[in-house]
């Protein structure tokens, strides 16, 4: 798979361990993580640090076996980066693949005044294919 696969106009699929995202100037992003296999706290903290410093206060959505850990580490990392800022990095954890896919479908249908890109980052290809299929 390419490092960043374009799935439709503004939706991209990215494999967690080998993929990469390059921010586009004047675009906002929403990021959706499928995290079934990655539970290394140091790796997650490095990912959170990289993403929050690159994309700032955007929305990070998590689904999968390790979503609670990812959400907690992203929240903790955001507090380290923005300790006194009242506007927080937004994180959401979804209990089911269906609710996660529904949220992704919903945001893809919305109209935005500012160009918006959506990234589906995954560490479980089977679940990734399932979510992509549910959003078509």
Task: Report residues per predicted region.
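ATP-dependent carboxylate-amine ligase
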Residues: 2-136
